Swiss-Prot record:
Domain Myosin motor: 35-758
Protein purpose: Actin-based motor molecule with ATPase activity that localizes to the mitochondrion outer membrane. Motor protein that moves towards the plus-end of actin filaments. Required for mitochondrial inheritance during mitosis. May be involved in mitochondrial transport or positioning.
UniProt-listed GO biological process terms: mitochondrion migration along actin filament; mitocytosis; regulation of cytokinesis; regulation of mitochondrial fission
Protein name, UniProt field: Unconventional myosin-XIX
Location (main, coarse): mitochondrion
Gene name in the database record: Myo19
Description of its domains: The MyMOMA (MYO19-specific mitochondrial outer membrane-association) region mediates association with the mitochondrion outer membrane via electrostatic interaction.
Species per Swiss-Prot/TrEMBL record: Mus musculus
Amino acid sequence: MLQQVNGHSLGSDAEGRASLKGDLREFLGGEIPLHQLDDLTKVNPVTLETVLRCLQARYTEDIFYTNAGCTLVALNPFKHVPQLYAPELMQEYHAAPQPQKLKPHIFTVGEQTYRNVKSLIEPVNQSIVVSGESGAGKTWTSRCLMKFYAVVAASPTSCENHKIAERIEQRILNSNPVMEAFGNACTLRNSNSSRFGKFIQLQLNRAQQMTGAAVQTYLLEKTRVACQASSERNFHIFYQICKGATKDERLQWHLPEGTAFSWLPNPESSLEEDCFEVTREAMLHLGIDTPTQNNIFKVLAGLLHLGNVHFVDSEDEALPCQVMDDTKVSVRTSALLLQLPEKMLLESMQIRTIKAGKQQQVFQKPCSRAECDTRRDCLAKLIYARLFDWLVSVINSSICADSKSWTAFIGLLDVYGFESFPNNSLEQLCINYANEKLQQHFVAHYLRAQQEEYEVEGLEWSFVNYQDNQTCLDLLEGSPISICSLINEECRLNRPSSAAQLQTRIESTLAGRPCLGHNKLSREPSFVVVHFAGPVRYHTAGLVEKNKDPVPPELTELLQQSQDPLLTMLFPANPEEKTQEELSGQSRAPALTVVSKFKASLEQLLQVLHNTTPHYIRCIKPNSQSQPQTFLQEEVLNQLEACGLVETIHISAAGFPIRVSHQNFIERYKLLRRLGPRMSSGLGGLEPAEGSSEQPLCAKEATLQPLLQDILHALPALIQTAATPSDPAKNTQIPLYCGRTKIFMTDSMLELLECGRAQMLEQCARCIQCGWRRHRLQKQEKQRRAAVLIQAAFRSWLTRKHIRRLHIAATVIKHAWHKWRIRMACLASKELDGMEEKPMPQAPGTLRSSMSPAHTRFLGAIIHLWPLGLVLANSADGVRGFQRKLVAHACLRLPSDRPSNKVQTPQQDQAGITSIRALPQGSIKFHCRKSPLQYADICPDPSASCVTGFNQILLESHRPVQV
């Protein structure tokens, strides 16, 4: 320990302890607000100890998530916290305008990736890398993120689409319990440890709705089926079928209660993962029907009985090993469940078939006891590995969407954490190698690449040292010689190789490598690799055999003869297919080893991650006993050192995680130019964020495009608008830096720009809507005016047409009236003045001869409608008294072609007056007698309303007189 404080050496250990206690009390006095620090970049000073204190203070307050710049630190609570993952909380983070301002949570990372896919300048797929030691909570974190995306990425409009989306989401969520049941197991460090790696692609369409998913798995630990370490368990599914099967199923699968199985250690322990009904229901939702499920569980029960088969050496070495008497029942039961011939099953494990020579002559050799056990284990591992791969393919076919229906994806990487056990073999070597590659991806993407980019873009940056694991990767996978290459070479040499020989070769060939060590106290052959998370000792015993992963052809041929429908599907009998050994024997091509295949799949995964925008979640395990409310500083400190969290905090506190090219920045945020005036001079008082250069915001403003300058000039107005009294920092600093080709900014600045852009888009949309409404109203007004004009013109035309018709009718009536008046006047004067003692019909006859029948009928119809006063007014002026009435009567009885309109002649009316003469001037003496005329005795009534007298005579005059 360095005994120096403020430049003064401490005189004694007592003074040092006193000073340390004083500093500790001072630190503890300020520990109260530590749990309120949501971001470790705000810790001052940023050291490993202060970060550790802050995490411990938050863990004590049941705050399990803390930001560390671009990384989220997640502490495993080792207890259920239902309110921390409630659906209401998911909706709260999804609906928040700025989720970064809420409490740190995995939902913040999930929402950030979802919004990046939704509104990213350059549409790039997103990925979330969940890393940490075994038991740190990676699987739980991935499961909660999948539930979060299932909630927020489902917003279809129609009811039918909503049902389809719900079905897809349910299938995606149901894939978790199935894969955990068949791929997870209880280990020394974790009760639900993932024994395989998986990368889940959540597929989104253009509307950011989840349309499907795809699962890719890596390196299933199939050796766990036949070999479990002390105090560990087999895969969960074996315990589920033994504990959850019904009585009928137990009889069908030959699993009586209390039966002990060699491959089922620690069956008395009860875990939450041993829920058989959840697994069966999830399989049913994924399209695996009940008969197929029963077939799967029957095969698994056959594997358990196969594990109870044990061999003993034969007395005669020329004879194969014999099965123990107490395990013969297990052979029979296993053959029955797998639907294999019992004899062939035993022979495939007891006898080895060898093909030699050019003619491929077949020889049979009895196997030793160890070889029989190895072939038995190989048969079980082969069946379980094929079954697991088939389940993954069924899950993908059930949840994967068509490639044309999705445009982007969010990847969730959940791999096994760093492992170090008392006995580490090839599985732990591959697992830790994968963690080294992921650590290098984080270092290369964030720690190294970000700082190098700052320097290239012209930012005045103080380089932060970090722990690089490239030397360890060179030891593991370097070219031309590395640990993996040496192990693969031992497999290709096809010679007996002992564990000590492999150890000697590794130590001698790779001597001098800084990350290679040796435990001199160990009696077993082994070598030590110093990983980024700590040194791990690997035993070389069985390392080469596991890397070869040989499958005897007899076992494959045996399984192809099974009558079980599932095994027939997993091992199709294809005569054209040749085994790996046959192909390698004929072509002499090197066989693919476990390390080679795993390395290839890992490179493919890293290439996918390289093409996405990564987000990191560091899961920390507070204690190795998985106890709640227990924070062991030493264990947490080792994990913080291993993952380089302090370096991450340093770079995040002073850096700009968001980088956008000038062109993309202009294309997306050119709307913000309207917020501020356009200027051609400097940017005034704008300064970069803390930790960057002291120069103005844009050091090379002359080379920038005018649009970019206008946008940068508008930023102060945008920040001033968003500033609040409680957040005065926004009034003084702009967390944005303009590099040579890119714009660098913080997450808060990006959120601010997006809010300003959304407001401008809203204003533009409002202007467009107003203009459209104005145009639509103006168009409607023009249409209304045109319609009114057309209606007025049409009504005017109709009116003129009607008036024209009335005018024509009036003209006709007027002409007819004038003709009638003239003729009546002429007729009356002739009758009165020049036609003495002439019969009255002459006038009608003359009129009839001068008028056409049509005019006569027309005038008759009109005259019959005339009132009597009009007739009398148009009669001769010299006629008075009774003669005037007779003239009127004669006028009304016009000539007509109808018989009823004929005027009686004087000969027909001899009893009345026979002529009308001009009265002589002077006194006249009338000699009266009783008149023979009809109605002569009726006196006209002067009342106009009474139809009596002469009016009655006139009305009835058209009727013929009955003689």
